[in-house]
Amino acid sequence: MKDVMGLIFTGENDIHLGELTSLRAVAALPIAGRYRVIDFQLSSMVHSGIKNVGVITQKNYSSLMDHIGSGREWDLHGKQGLVMLPPFLTRENMGVYSGLLDALKSNCTYLRLSRQEYIVLTNSHTIYNMDYTDALKYHIEKGADVTVLYAHGAKAVGTEGENDTFLSVDEDGKVTGMEIGS
């Protein structure tokens, strides 16, 4: 998948994790003593053939940077293989992204300079393994602007619905509506 770059957003709301995320990002939380939450997204991207991955950080990302290092564990240590994208202090940005859209806007230069035509954008707080190859093929075949991967009827445990996003889709799978935080 030469024409695809990966982008992992690590600025999720961590309010339910309290002390666990007081000094580290959700993406840097340990899993089974050896892995971190972000390992699943990085591995899924690399196993899908994605060779250029940007990690958008928000706060408490020191341990995340220590864990990821140069990206060698995922064979992303070459030129443009793995890029950390912290919130830089600028006129428009006070050093913290206000959300995903602000993070994307702040990193437009990085996105424009990439050689890839497509972007796989994911968060870092969901643990799963996935091969994105079929999803990208589907996206290209449909000529879609955006393709959303979702689980039908899934609900995150312990979220009490405050940040859930519900999609309405037609019989062809096209999104016809969206409700956030109901």
Where in this protein do the model-derived segments appear?
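Unchanged
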Residues: 1-182
